[in-house]
Each structure stands twice: as C-alpha cells, then as structure tokens.
Amino acid sequence: MAAAKSDPHSYVLPIAESQRIFDRDIVPAELGSLGSSKTTDGNIKPVAVFVVGQTGAGKTRTAPAIKVVMQSHRGQPAHFIADTYKTYHPAYPRLVVEAPALASPATGTDARRWLAMAAEHAIGRGIDVLLESACRNPADFADLAQAFHDAGYRVEVAIMAVPEGLSRLGILTRFYERLPEAGSRNLPPRLTPTKVHADSYEGLLDAAVFVDESSAVDQIVVVRRDHAVAYANERVNGSWKRAAATRKSLMEQRDRCLPKELSIARKDIENLRGLAIPELPPQLEEIESLLGPLMDENNNTHAPPLRLLVLPDIGVAGHSYDVNLDLTLGTIADNQ
C-alpha cells in the first residue's frame, strides 16, 4: 500500500463527491431523526446556541448541560460538533493510523464545508441547533452565526474562558488518562497538536470581537469550566443592555486561575509525570511556566466576582422567569 500523501490540500474532495457524502452519510446520521421545527408559536424563533472554546477548554462537559435544558423546553436540537465531521472523510480512518498529525489538516476543509451544509440543512427546516466549535477558523463561527441570524434564528453564545496552561493540560490529561472527552462522539481518542491549540486559543479572541461588534448575536455569556459566569449580556431592540465587553472579559479570565482549578492542575501534572512517558516532561514544564504567574493569589484581588450560570429550569413550562437568565436558550418570546 502506498504511503499517505503529505500535502493536506491533495485530500480535498471534489464538490460532487463531498455533496454525495453529505447526502448519503451525514444527513441520516446527524439530522435524519429531527424532522422539522416543532415550534408552533409564531412569536418564538428557532434558536442556535454556540459553545465555543479552544481545544481542551471543556466544551465537551459544558455543552451537555445546555443540551439538557434545550431538550426540556424545546425538544431535541441538532447537535453539531465541528471536529466530528472529519470522520466522514474517506481518508480519515487511514490517516489516523498512518499519519495522525496529517489527519486533521487533510480532512479539515471538507469537514468545514459539511458543517456549513449541515447548518444550511437545519436552517431550511427551522431546526434548533447546538453547535460546539474550537474557533480555529473564527471566520467560520462568524459566518455560521450570521447565517442563523439572517434566517431569523435567535443566536446565543457561550464562550469558554480558560487559561492557556489549563487547556493545554486538559488536552494531555484527557488523552493519557483516556477520559471520555478525548474522543468526541465518533472521533477516536486524539492528542491535539500544540499548534492547533494555539490557533484556536487566538481564534477565540476574534470570535469575541465578532460577538461585541456584530448584530448577529442576541445573547452572550463568558463562562469558566465550572459554569461560573464572568460576563453576560443581551441585545434588546438591537443594542446591548451593557457595554460590550466579551473580548475584555475573556482576556481578564485567561489571566485568572481559581484555587480549585490550580489544585486540580497540580494533581493532573503529578499524575502525568507518574506515567513516565518520555515526551511529557518538556510539555509539562511549558504548562507549569504558563500557570506560574496565575498562581499568585494577588492576581485575583481586582478580578470581578463570579457567579453560577443561570439557565431556564428543567421541566418548568412557560416563558416567564423571575431571574435574569444568562442564556434564555430561545425559551422567551420576542414580545416579552
């Protein structure tokens, strides 16, 4: 068998083949059981909820909590995980085995195309959507959010605010300790390359700027791994209730490490060192250097207070609430 080609661009599929795979494989697997919109109240828009964060930030644990609430109030949403579309590429299974570092870049172009096609499919049927993305290509996030907005959807966004050292450590921990989030849905367990993490870490800042400056997003929450909220805002009649500060909040929280997070990080580093894997010590030293400045307790002196994420109560009927929701998840009609 010939060796895998090294040029990622050589794996991009012709448009016709890409469309066939979408129709034959992706629609039945990702969208086939959802039908069309179950919303009968003309005052309530379909909703698209984005959970975005760099690789290793903790999206795999945050998104399910949001999905449960969406299911309770509106029924099953389409759940799109951007990375999983790579597995539909015919070259992906071989590349994962023979050239793991090539698997993602070689299949990424088609995966991004399929994600956009899945979103278009959902929009055409008014299906609610929950979408997870690492924002390595922030323009994709912006395009998708704008597409949902232009189609009449309510767009809500949760941005994961996680320090660089913690998300890099999270990548190593989930892989070497074989945690479930190492392989989202039908993805095999994977060790995300450092450059991919760096790209998504930077891309998230661009996504935050888009949220602040675009009219496409109706509600935003900046949240940490433990569902602690640092910033929340909502548009009313096209304008933010508060000064737009998504990017500012994201940057502030990235420079802040909570005591519980540090305690867990120290234990994770100790456990990984105990595995005696030759390539780990240099990476752990880098991570410790990233976390070092955050271990100073004085860093948190002037940080804004955090509070728990507020979502609609599961099982509570109706659209009126006595508290301000960080994400309404489309449960509140526009005229209320």
Per-segment meaning from a language model:
Residues 59:
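Conserved lysine of the Walker
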Residues 49-50:
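Short hydrophobic/aromatic beta-strand immediately N-terminal to the Walker A/P-loop
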